[in-house]
């Protein structure tokens, strides 16, 4: 039997995802449990975190387990990921040893590793996460790399709670690009597109120009999900028509992939579209729609104060749900091992 990881939701069946969401809702009602009693998880952070680190540490504790946080290059040795490399530079040990040793100590490994923002053809291979999964003898959880599957489930649970049903089919869902002074990772956008189409919603990807359309892998996943789950998928560059009648508006900033690693000429293009900010006028076009964002969010850059403080904003609910869905993920995966 092969080891089951949580690297992206597309690897899990709809029934398995529904089971995770059901368990997360149960954990939300009953905080403490014993599913991880005597178990441990190594949380490996190559990039900063607030919600992810806090929710995973507390989640393990609340289920009777223990979390160990490691930051390679800071409080742990820098890691090499390429085979055949003559390691006479800054890296001190190879992932082949790191993952296998950690797997002898702990029962789960979580990994957060953002793209390097230099070469998308390399970053899209998700080398760090896949290397941990390759060598680890215990399940690996994606804590955000080029996708953010934990955020996907937290978002889905928040929507199910708001609409009072696990069935989100037929809801009009807008994934809108928003301005940010820096080019950001596409991970959350990739994940939002994936889970929204998986849930059978009518999804519109709203972005300024074709350059901001997401990587073809995730567009293909979305099309596959539409075929299997119903719903629809379209790309729009027209703000008002995209917002019109929307039940859900989900905002995220990301850099244009054609400029990946060459961001200087992309910045003046991005700067032209600061009006993509989510504001009261746009939300008034919706069907009393809810707004959410993965956080952190720069107020009055990505969304206005009024939108963030509106009763229709469910971003805090979504953030809370990170705790509950991650407990469900850990509980579902723990106990597996391979020689």
Curated annotation (Swiss-Prot):
Q: In which pathway does it act?
A: Amino-acid biosynthesis; L-arginine biosynthesis
Q: Which residues does the UniProt site feature Key residue in conferring substrate specificity for N-acetyl-L-ornithine versus N-succinyl-L-ornithine point to?
A: 92
Where found?
Cytoplasm
Q: What is the effect of changing residue 92 to A/P/S/V?
A: Generates an enzyme capable of carbamoylation of N-succinyl-L-ornithine while losing its ability to use N-acetyl-L-ornithine as substrate, thus converting it from a N-acetylornithine transcarbamylase (AOTCase) to a N-succinylornithine transcarbamylase (SOTCase)
This enzyme's EC code(s)? 2.1.3.9
Q: Which domain of life is it from?
A: Bacteria
Q: Which Gene3D superfamilies match?
A: Aspartate/ornithine carbamoyltransferase
Q: What is this protein called?
A: N-acetylornithine carbamoyltransferase
The organism encoding this protein is Xanthomonas campestris pv. campestris (strain ATCC 33913 / DSM 3586 / NCPPB 528 / LMG 568 / P 25)
Q: Which gene is transcribed and translated to give this protein?
A: argF'
